[in-house]
From Swiss-Prot:
Function noted in UniProt: Light-harvesting photosynthetic bile pigment-protein from the phycobiliprotein complex.
Binding site for (2R,3E)-phycoerythrobilin 1: C82
A GO CC term assigned to this protein in UniProt: phycobilisome
Bilayer topology term: Peripheral membrane protein
The protein's name: R-phycoerythrin alpha chain
Source superkingdom: Eukaryota
One family name in Pfam for this protein: Phycobilisome
Length: 164
């Protein structure tokens, strides 16, 4: 799984060298942010049901046409699948926070997702709206510390940009 540490080691190994000073500074920065990432991961895990519900609700409020006949959310079963997808991506964001890299989203979330959504007539913009809502509803210090919020929002930004 890709993280700052594994990427640094892989690059050094591929070049047949030891990690450079700048490589080690990058790893050190990643380690220094670990406590904030783990705080964000813990808060997300303990509140994930509410986060997923609010994010999904925001999606369907913004894109109410999705519940029209023939659209992606025209039955309760399809609506439930959308919430399931939001939950899946939020778990991947949690995993990214834990490992300190984007590997979980890259490897398990993005590869082929846009093509699948197009084939199933599921607009990625609706998912993007869900994740933007989850990012924007964050309130520091109510939900987590400022640094944990930066880590959380940064991972959601990465996911949003990957889905666009």
């Amino acid at each position: 799984m890709k993280s700052v540490i594994t990427t640094t080691i892989s690059a050094a190994d591929a070049a047949g060298r030891f990690p450079s000073s700048s490589d080690l500074e990058s790893v050190q920065g990643n380690i220094q942010r670990a406590a904030a990432r783990l705080e964000a991961a813990e808060k997300l895990a303990s509140n994930h049901e509410a986060v997923v519900k609010e994010a999904g609700d925001a999606c369907f409020a913004k894109y109410s046409y999705l519940k029209n006949p023939g659209e992606a959310g025209d039955s309760q079963e399809k609506v439930n699948k959308c919430y399931r997808d939001v939950d899946h991506y939020m778990r991947l964001v949690n995993y990214c926070l834990v490992v300190g890299g984007t590997g979980p989203v890259d490897e398990w979330g993005i590869a082929g997702a846009r093509e699948v959504y197009r084939t199933l007539n599921l607009p990625t913009s609706a998912y993007v709206a869900s994740f933007a809502f989850a990012r924007d509803r964050l309130c520091v210090p109510r939900d987590m510390s400022a640094q944990a919020g930066v880590e959380y929002a940064g991972n959601l930004d990465y996911l949003i940009n990957a889905l666009c």
